[in-house]
Amino acid sequence: MWNKLQCPRTELELLFTLCGGQCFRWRKSGNNEWTGVFGKRVWILSQDESNILYKVVTSSQQQTKGRKRKLEKEPLAKTTNKHGDDDLSVEREMLREYFRLDVPLEQHYAQWSSQDPHFKSAAVKFKGVRILAQDPVENVFSFICSSNNNIARISSMVEKLCSLYGQQIAEVDGTMYYDFPPVEALTGTSVENKLREAGFGYRAKYIHQSACRIMEMGGADWLDKLKTLSYVEAKTQLIKLSGVGAKVADCICLMSLGHLESIPVDTHIYQVAAQNYLPHLRGRKTVTDKMYTEIGEHFRTLYGPLAGWAHTILFCADLKMFQEDTPAKKKKKA
């Protein structure tokens, strides 16, 4: 049995939000259905035009049942947690926070569209793109894996990291799902070699060194404190980690630290900027630090305090994987 959270599709499109390079724990598990992990739970998400539909599995549920849960046949039991709240209301609130549903997205789309003709044309086919509020630890190490990589391979590496060092949560449809490992689990002396053997290459060293550095600074609490700093201060601290340059630091600031003005500039965004906004940058072979700053400042001036959100919509619109898979195109074919 599906639980429902009212949310129109124009406010959240799962395909773009879950599969657009923000988080690497989600996979398509059925028609209009995605399975992934956050908050020490396995989530199965779907949607109709008016609602997010969801099912949740936790390790405690499986231990209580002592068998595999048949999700499609068996409704979730309504239980209470230590605060006296029922799990259903807690999980509904977790979804609201994860998808930042407090932000009225349609209003911002209208505002950005009125300011920018290129955004307006992209937004027609790419409605409902949201910035996820991710766990900073997972976000940091996921994007260390992103260096010179594609979404499919990053996803594979992140899942390998979880299966090697994370705690089992639950088995769903024959697949075991794991929580993301805590920072301290990645500081062991054997971590780098083990990750190299698992195909992480030079990223293995970055993961181990960054884990050790984060623990020296105070662990996950230190990362959480970066939310209270200014965007520039938080980015400056992140760049001190191994394997974290300007783009990765901006991804972390945007996707897990709440600095929504952050603009990660990769080849996609460079091409979008040069083609549509900053023509004097066309034809450059590499994005210099000066160009990186210029592109970021241009979008911040154009879009304001949620510039990183608007930029993410343009990023999704430029991804080849979405060119033939937009809900708008599917409706037209039907």
Task: Report residues per predicted region.
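HhH-family (HhH-GPD) DNA N-glycosylase catalytic core used in base-excision repair
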Residues: 1-334
